Amino acid sequence: MSLFNKVTKTFQWGQHTVTLETGEISRQAGGAVIVNIDDTVVLATVVGAKNAKPGQDFFPLTVDYIEKTYAAGKIPGSFFKREAKPSELEVLTSRLIDRPLRPLFPEGFYNEVHVVVHVLSLNPEASADIAALIGSSAALAISGIPFNGPVGAARVGYVNGEYVLNPGPTQLKSSKMDLVVAGTEAAVLMVESEADQLTEEVMLGAVVYGHEQAKVAIAAINELVRDAGKPAWDWQPPARNEPLIAKVAEFGLAKIEAAYQIRNKQARTHACRAAYAEVKISLAEAGVVFDNVDVDNLLFELEAKTVRGQILQGEPRIDGRDTRTVRPIEIRTGVLPRTHGSALFTRGETQALVVATLGTDQDSQRIDALAGDFRDSFLFHYNMPPFATGEVGRMGTTKRRETGHGRLAKRALVPLLPPKDEFGYTIRVVSEITESNGSSSMASVCGGCLAMMDAGVPMKAHVAGIAMGLIKEGNRFAVLTDILGDEDHLGDMDFKVAGTTAGVTALQMDIKIQGITKEIMQVALAQAKEARLHILGKMVEAMGTANTEVSNFAPRLYTMKINPEKIRDVIGKGGSVIRALTEETGCQIDIGEDGTITIASTDADKAELAKKRIADITAEAEIGKVYEGPVVKILDFGALINILPGKDGLLHISQIAHQRVEKVTDFLTEGQVVKVKVLETDEKGRIKLSMKALIERPEGMEFEERAPRREGGFGDRGDRGDRGPRRDRGGDRPERGERPARAEQPATEESGAPAAGQPQQQQGQQQ
């Protein structure tokens, strides 16, 4: 009999085969499900604490998505050779899972819940995030933990005018959209998308299409729960203390209503805190026994009731606006004198100081992703310190919220960036939130666009973002434009849309309630477009076009193309050549595999010097061309002359002078600069040089240099030069006696042939 009670459900989902399995692995977890989508395998587990911690006043849900490098057949590249802190992708995927799950836990459930997802195997063409979300939902559904799920999810692409279900990374390259939608069978709860300026109608259609496809996964999870689900927890929400509710309303309602008549955020916040304290004092004086957490929750309910009621009754919002008005906008560019580009974007009480910096390819970020390494040349970082909301807090590592907001702003801007071959810079944008009262991520989009234009980045169009909210009670609802922080907390939806005049580039939606219909989303998108166009108008007024020149403090990029086979010459042994070039010119030099060289420098003269040096290094010796260079080495049979950087040619002893050369050192010394002519090159790159080709032949020298003609010698053969004693050239040889006079030789010898029995003359002339 098997140890395991394994339950498996398999279904076809578009082009993918999906398997849900439980009962074999992680049996001691509250719920554990293995999800396999075309060989991408994830293990999703969930554990819930049986009791809430005393004094707990919020729902402590933690989601950890963890990619194991062995899933892709890799060993971690770190010094410790094991997985370390979460990557940005892991953080973003953890948030992606958290957002649709959190609203489905019942009100008042404060038990700690921990969802952990491990990626165990990865098919690069089947992304793990959708499998992780489905697995987390399934694990919660079978665990028995109070949960109003399950949740389904799907990715939607848009290729050739048609929606595509769960496209892989390769297919996404040709897609104009990457949208993830998650929700229950009844309603959409979360949307995360980037798009290439698509219309609101296309975006809404993708949400509806994705939700329909997600229902396929929900049906499979329900089947798994039917066969493998654990008993539901015996949990009931705490009974409402009606006498306490009445007393809190009696002492607090008027104070809360008065506080929400204050338009200034800081003053309103102070008034609310004072109201909380005064209510507790009044309760104590009245002899009411209460728990601070219970009173705080009841007062928060009064805040929500006050704000929501005012809006649904058509009264002004918290800051006095109607539902469609955008807060006043102030824009200033070129704020910081020595940065490459900067902008200060202020909308009401939300303000972003955004700075753009230009760098080279060496400044791009290397991403060691599970699906494969790549380099990212557009970086967007979002920071929100505690002082932005007038609070005291701890500064430290980047929080998940900051990572998520930065990625949303980046998604909004990427489609409008110039192509890399037109603008070769690495771009880093940093948004410093200096004030926050709602929609700081969308302020970062606006400020980021303006900062890059100030830096001289030729953006295709202006990009703006707006955050929308929703108040819904029964059949009544109101969509709010440009929501405040309080409206976000007290409302039912946070809906962020970014784009241009042509269409949407990013969309993020988080819904806290069920029952959001297609019609409501349609109204929200239309109202968001109206607000976006208003903000774009303000941005165009402040900065109509990008600066045509980059900042004086930014590096200029100069490009040149070389033969890829010459790359090794530019780099040199162990990087010696390029290192010397960098030190000499002060330029940053990047070399592409295709032979494209990018030189970055703030000094044009130094950049030109670097270009000349590289051109010299990669130049080919031209036959017949004259070069000047130093003698780098003396050889017995000639000398090596450096005619180009890294290129030496052979000057043979026979090509030094017209007359006979006995010793190379009689004519040349190491370090001497000489002019030479290239005679020929071979397929191995060897170069033959000549000095004598540049020297006029001495008078009386009719042919190549030869030894002087001996009296009575071999006919009239011209002056052959002083050949010196033969013994010196031929080594020790026996004396041969005195030669007979040339005139006494037979006439046939005059043609140059030796007499009978006479040894052949050695060919001593230089070749």
From Swiss-Prot:
Domain (S1 motif): give its ranges.
Answer: 624-692
Q: Which residues form the KH domain?
A: 555-614
According to its UniProt entry, the function of this protein is described as:
Involved in mRNA degradation. Catalyzes the phosphorolysis of single-stranded polyribonucleotides processively in the 3'- to 5'-direction.
> Which keywords accompany this UniProt record?
Cytoplasm, Magnesium, Metal-binding, Nucleotidyltransferase, RNA-binding, Transferase
What Gene3D superfamilies does this protein's entry cite?
A: GHMP Kinase, N-terminal domain (3.30.230.70), K Homology domain, type 1 (3.30.1370.10), Nucleic acid-binding proteins (2.40.50.140)
Under what name is this protein listed?
A: Polyribonucleotide nucleotidyltransferase
What residue spans carry the Low complexity bias annotation?
752-767
Q: Where does Mg(2+) bind?
A: 488, 494
What subcellular locations does the record give? Cytoplasm
UniProt KW Nuclease keyword: no
Q: Which biological process, per GO, is one annotated for this protein?
A: RNA processing
Q: Please give the CDD domains that the UniProt record associates with this protein.
A: KH-I_PNPase, RNase_PH_PNPase_1, RNase_PH_PNPase_2, S1_PNPase
Q: Cite the record's Basic and acidic residues compositional bias ranges.
A: 700-742
To which species is this protein native? Leptothrix cholodnii (strain ATCC 51168 / LMG 8142 / SP-6)
- Domain of life of the organism encoding this protein: Bacteria
Tell me its cofactors: Mg(2+)
